[in-house]
A protein has these predicted regions:
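Short, low-complexity disordered leader/linker segments with a strong preference
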Residues: 1-48
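N-terminal (or domain-start) structured segment
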Residues: 31-130, 194-218, 229
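Short, surface-exposed alpha-helical segments at coil->helix boundaries
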Residues: 60-64, 68, 182, 186, ...
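Hinge/capping helix and adjacent helix->loop/strand transition within the periplasmic-binding protein
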Residues: 75-77, 97-107, 120-206, 255, ...
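Short beta-strand segments
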Residues: 109-111, 172-174, 220, 239
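Short secondary-structure boundary segments
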Residues: 113, 149, 223-224, 242
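Short, high-confidence coil segments that cap the C-terminus of an alpha-helix
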Residues: 167-168, 216, 235
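C-terminal lobe and pocket-closing loops
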Residues: 228-262
Length: 262
């Protein structure tokens, strides 16, 4: 059991990148006949930025900070990035909406590891490198299992004890069963032989809030997404889904340490 939980959960990392929707025709360089063509001015109008999760989550906050900086430093004064939060389906609703837009460089979509996982489990036919043009990787970090500041699940031992007490004894907040947090929850369920009740929310911020208010016992979330709440004492970090210690929260145990291979 311990070996299985360490190996599976340690693979759940947040890979987050920005991509352009679709693969369109050439817009500069050479035309279909091979002759040189002049590159059009770009951009001349606002650029839509689809974030496939609700406002306030880790991806939303990071994206807005990035786009604001780029708007100020890299775009003409009459052009801005316009953020659109399109939540649902563990990120699939917004991602699929991005594919319906023209492949003209005026729509970009934030995607993360959820898309790859959803593809692997058959929830979508989207192939990242075929249906999108990746631009840049923005984030690569482990997930953190967090619990409330007080109560039965405020420590890893307490959470595991409650989990092991019977089916549906704990409730975990997730953004979708195909998300890293959803898979981590399934891994815990399989490892301990107990059913875990899950509640799906539109964003990681909503998941964290559900733990604070007591709606859920715990959630798996990006490390950077809860650093402020942990520092403020409203949430507690229980463990990392990582094979090594995190630089951002070095005092938190990691799963390969808590559950070493046997």
């Amino acid at each position: 059991m311990k070996k299985g939980i360490a190996l599976l959960l340690a693979t759940l990392m947040c890979l987050s990148l920005t991509a352009c929707g679709g693969t369109g025709e050439q817009s500069s360089g050479q035309d279909s006949s091979g002759e040189d063509t002049a590159a059009p001015d770009y951009p001349t109008t606002n650029i839509s930025c689809i974030i496939p999760y609700g406002a306030g989550g880790t991806m939303d906050q990071l994206s807005r900070a990035l786009f604001q900086s780029l708007s100020e430093d890299a775009l003409p004064s009459n052009v801005n990035f316009v953020v659109e939060n399109v939540a649902g389906g563990g990120g699939l609703v917004g991602t699929e909406q991005g594919l319906t837009r023209a492949a003209d460089g005026y729509t970009i979509v934030r995607v993360n590891g959820d898309l790859i996982i959803n593809r692997a489990i058959g929830a979508t036919d989207i192939v990242l490198r075929e249906d999108f043009t990746p631009i840049v990787c923005l984030q690569d970090e482990p997930y953190c299992l967090i619990g409330p500041a007080d109560g039965d699940c405020s420590t890893l031992e307490g959470f595991i004890n409650k989990l092991s007490s019977g089916d549906n004894a704990v409730t975990v907040a997730i953004t979708g069963l195909g998300s890293p947090g959803g898979l981590a929850t399934i891994a815990l369920s399989n490892a301990f032989g107990c059913q875990i009740r899950t509640v799906t929310y539109d964003s990681s911020n909503d998941c964290a809030l559900a733990v604070v208010t007591g709606e859920c016992d715990a959630t798996f979330i990006n490390v950077s997404g809860v650093a402020g709440q942990i520092e403020a004492g409203t949430l507690k970090r229980l463990d990392f889904t990582s094979a090594e210690e995190s630089d951002s929260l070095p005092e938190t145990p990691y799963l390969a340490q808590t559950y070493p291979e046997e």
